């Protein structure tokens, strides 16, 4: 799947055409994929970035998933091992040597303007449900070329952060990475104003049917709460796992004190 000029992708945020899906279980069959490199920092005082590969899979039923390809592959190998008769320990050994990606992913549901934020903490998946807010974009006059596409610049706020983004009207999809969407074209690059987070599009294209997205929230124990609650739980887990284990009922963590941990949340809770 490589970026090709002139590819026409459905504009999925035509809300009127999605009303029939708003109150039912949506199909996870995806028809289009956009691949992003996600650069992020855990400590703003250190140079360089950590990186993960994230897929934006756009489903026919009017929603989209944004998830770590590395984590999804690791989980799929584990599930395949279990399906072939391995026990949990054996399946864990199979994936031990595989790289680890980030645990969080999101499901944007346009018909009812909801976002579902999933993150696996210990052995449970925490699902936070919130309003899918349309960022208030200001389109500025700058242009640039990215991957051969003419891109326009816009500035807006999403998830409590200010973002500078570049979108291309050549790809008629008002989508983008994470909670960034609603512009007249696909967002190819986004960076927050602090410089701690960046999304850069690498590839985009159609998926050979049928392709169904299967993620950790589909087969693990899930705890549901509001979006802010899930983000707070994730932040506590990253900064103070010992406290997290106690507060959320996983038991007391034994062993020596944990060294200070650094973490910058992507989503800023009010």
List each model region and its residues.
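Bacterial Sec-dependent N-terminal signal peptides
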Residues: 1-29
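Extended soluble regions of mature proteins
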Residues: 24-270
